């Protein structure tokens, strides 16, 4: 196994001491970077980019070449799994993802099956290629994160046929035919576990489950239709590979009211959106998990001084509840395509500098 030059991200997920707070950004390889847009133009389409391991490797490394980030995340899409199930994924310009064959009837659901992981080999090849490309002077620069959508979030797209403002189609099925929804979610959970395990086998050193639409569910429905199936995913995961622990991060956007229950399904870390107070979240989870987050992504449209002030606020909030260890800095959701790249430099600089000062006792956490 190649040694890591920088393992702060993995140590933070294990709640071990780090010299500073590590960070990475959701969608860090994306449309806000001109170099990403140039590569995407060469690929011809988003799917042409995501399904080509060489292109996926190139764009995964682009933010690391621009910023001193502490982790890389596989460039892919959460909808690769339902695409492999035969739902016919496409991306229309300006419209987002669409499925040609959404799950609308009992017959549709009856035909659904866990896909052959060989049909997703392009993802696993990308993981392997990225791991190799991260090696510099005989050591790997930073760890690589693999990921998947949660069973519920995948089901939202699979039933709606694309994105939605109100999820009325998938929710109507959930309320009217819970048996069909449970079948979809059970298949999705099995598929997600297998998909993440294959990423781990290919070289992912941590994995994240994106429950982007869990927060759209009512209390009670969340536990039954999202959390229960993320628990099943985690129960099926390899938590160790090649002699190394594989940390697992779970992120439910809008899930702040359920932190204790999310911690109860056994992740190593919980991702938080910007509506959650970090100090309170830390007290509520009683140090059982690391926390990841959680600055509002739109802060990156503000002035340099405002960005630095907001970064310090996030770091101070976490540190005020018992020191800085066990925190991975991130945005509360994905970075906007309109973000000025130079503002990301300011954020990264302030995270590293202020968190070092907190640990050295040069500044006190403002409460």
Swiss-Prot record:
It is found in: Cytoplasm. Disulfide bonds: none annotated. It is an enzyme of class 4 (lyase). It comes from the Bacteria. The keyword Oxidoreductase does not apply. HAMAP family: URO_D. Belongs to the uroporphyrinogen decarboxylase family. This is Uroporphyrinogen decarboxylase. It comes from Cupriavidus metallidurans (strain ATCC 43123 / DSM 2839 / NBRC 102507 / CH34) (Ralstonia metallidurans). The lineage of its organism: Bacteria, Pseudomonadati, Pseudomonadota, Betaproteobacteria, Burkholderiales. The gene is hemE.
